[in-house]
Amino acid sequence: SINFVLEPKYKTILSDGYAVEDIIKNISMIEYSKRFIAGDTVIIFDELQSFPDIATALKSFRIDGRFDVICSGSLLGI
């Protein structure tokens, strides 16, 4: 999982835009051990309230369809 509070370095994953391919590439550049397998990988974005821009990328993940995404956080106001 990616926790935006405990690991603020991940707040740069949208630096190349909201395309899934760019986000996956940027996550992999930050943490080489993270592997993404289409149809098998679940990406967990935790503490979403600390990086609300990632919510905009969720539609890209839905359209792309290769990865399931789970988001969690506190004080989201949902």
What are these regions (language model features)?
Residues 1-78:
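Phosphate-binding site recognition
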